[in-house]
Structure formats: structure tokens, C-alpha cells
Amino acid sequence: MLDCIVNRFVAALICLSVIPSLASAADNLGVLGSKPKWSVLENYQDTITHDEFAHLINDVYCTHGFAQDLIKIENDAAQILTNRESRTTFTLRFASDPISKARIPRLWRPAKSLPSAQPDKPLGGLRIALDPGHLGGKWAKMEERWFQVGDTKPVTEGDLTLRVSRMLASRLKKLGATVLFVRNSTQPITSKRPGDFKELARKILIKNGLPQPRPDVLDPSDPEKQQTIRWQSEMLFYRYSEIRRRAVLVNTKLHPDLTVCLHFNAEGWGDPANPTLIDNNHLHLLVGGSYLQDELELDDQRFEMIRRLLSRAYDEELAISDTVATSMAKATGLPAYQYPTTLTTTKVGSSGYVYARNLLAPRLYRCPVVYCEPYVMNSKDGFARIQAGDYDGTKQINGVDQKSIFREYADSVAEGLAEYYRNARRKGD
């Protein structure tokens, strides 16, 4: 689920330098970020032309602009600032023309590099990781991905996404894919827990102008809960530590050709014990990009952006996302979500349903990522369909015959992936 209104206090976390206890004072990193290994980019020398690099920087990754000393695009190379204090830079050489480009080092395989597959197995040989968003279970209330209407079954996003991922897995396997789970239970991937981040949370709050932060939240409706050590330490656990550990799993053990992140969307519901149900229901997908200027100031995010750009994940994930979005739109009949602001996103692709946005998982996962955000959980229709659970065939909900929302989700993603790879794989092998 994406928060439709960005909380400025929370957003400020992203722009903080790491506290000296976690990194040297000269490091300029995001929350729980790692010091960049700029030498890794040597592997990408001569793999991209000037025009390709300039296009991806200006039209995809840095659509909100950037400080001119961060990235200087010259005729034959780009100068990328690695440390503002020391003024050191990394020189990325461009290939002189498309024919002379060196091979791109990456573990994932683009569709066009795969041999043709059997008609009924368009995903044959493909490694697909499924990443059901959030945690659910006992963590759902902490994540603020929980609400309940009266005596009905609570709606918990992490449990919903896990249910969809298991259904999707069986469909992808039938289509020939090897399916890997980033998460297949309600247990966190990270070994850390909120208590491990209390001291860091306290320092972050002090750095943000709260010299004596409160230790605990008074109640769920506490208007100042985001200024408490408890709330911040919980966020450091479930948002930052958890997603970073998932990235380690994806990048060092699973090595997928594609990761599918499964979410349900929502709009502000107010009191989770007495939530507001709304008429709006919509769909959109996300790809990595559209970095904010403040985000680009952080050394680790700038490094991660350049590394991802050079891997060419964007071209692959956009094409896949457009195809999956079209499949999901046809199956669900949902309109495209329209962000209320363009300050954090950039609309991309041809389907009308895909946006570029700088989210942690698509930034860190070293492969193409399809990030799905269908259905508004607290819409009247979405809520009714979630309450109806899973079932065969169709059931009349709000006067309309509808499939199980879980099967509709899984089927439409599987059909979109099958269509993309069926058309994009090499022909005639």
C-alpha cells in the first residue's frame, strides 16, 4: 500500500545522514544505508552510449532535476560525485557507438536473450521471485496495514498479499517458471526487531529538532505518535531493515530474472477500528525512477541509481509492467490511479497505468521489478470482495457478478507475464 499523502516528518527520515554510530561522520547515507562501493561501477565501463545515458538520467531517473555537481554528462564520459566533502568523482566512460558497447554485467536475463519456449510454457526456464508486500499477522497493526469494520474480519494487507502470491506461484509454475518466494510466511526476513532501533530512533528524532522525544505512543489516534521513539523504531524495523534484508536475499541467494512485488492499495481510512469506506477504486504499477533532488544528495541512493541505470533493468521492467498493467486493467475494469501530485512520481510507458517512483525495493533489487498496486482495500467494492474471501466461479457482490479478488489478481498478473514473454522471447530457435 502506498500512502497517498506524504507525511513530511516521515519523508525527512529518508534525507537524513546516518548517525555516526552506524557510519563515519563523513558518510552521507540514507536510513540504514550502506557505504557505496563505487569501484563496482568499473564493470560498466563502455556499456552505454552518451545518448542512452542522458535519456535515462533526464527522462527516467532524475525527472525532478539534480544539482549540477552531482552528475556531469560530457561527450565521452559522465563525472559522478562520490563524496561531496572530498569532492571525489567517478568517471564513467561512454561507448562511442551502439555497436562498440561492452557486455552489460548482470545475473538476470532479458526476455530477448532467452530461447523460444513451448507455446504452453512461455515462462519456461525463467526464475521469478514473488515478494508479497508487508508482513501481516501479528505485525499488521504495527505496520498500520490493518483495519476492521465492526465485527467483520480484519483487513491486513500483508496477509492478503501472501495469499495472492501463493495463488500466483501455482499459475506461474504451470507456465514453466521456477518460482522463488522472498517471503512465504508472516515472519520478517530481518533478524532485527523494533527494540534494536530505539537508540537510532532517539538520535533521529533529536536530529529532527526534538531534544527530548517521548518514548511511547499514547494510543493509535495520538496525533504526535510519529514523534515518539517507539513509532520511529518500529518503522526502522518493518520498513527499512525488513526491505533491506529482502534485497540481500534477492541479490545474493535467489538471483531472479524478475521480481514481482504484490501490494494492495488504500486511501486514508482514519481510525482503523472505525475506518472510512470510500467509492474510489483504482489500479497502478510502479517502476524505479523519478528520484527527488534531496534523495540524489545521498551517496548510497545516487550510487544505487547509477548502478540500476547501467543494468538496463528499466527498459525490461517498463515493458513487462505495461503488459501486466493492460492485463490487470482488462480483468479488473479499474481506472488508472492519478497521483494528486507530480512531486514524487513520473508517468511512464504506454498503458497509462505505470509510474516511475523511487521506492526502496525497486531501487535495491538487482533485477527488473514489477510492482503491483491494484484495488483500494477500503473502497466499498474492494472491502466487500475481500470479505467475500476466495471462491470458485463468480459471486454477486454489490449487485455485480465478480470473481474472487484473489484469483482475479493472480490470474491477471500471470496472464500479463505470459503474454509479455511469449512475444518477447527469441523466435525460431
Where are these regions (language model features)?
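Catalytic-site microenvironment of enzymes
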Residues: 2-5, 9, 24-429
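Bacterial N-terminal signal peptides
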Residues: 10-21
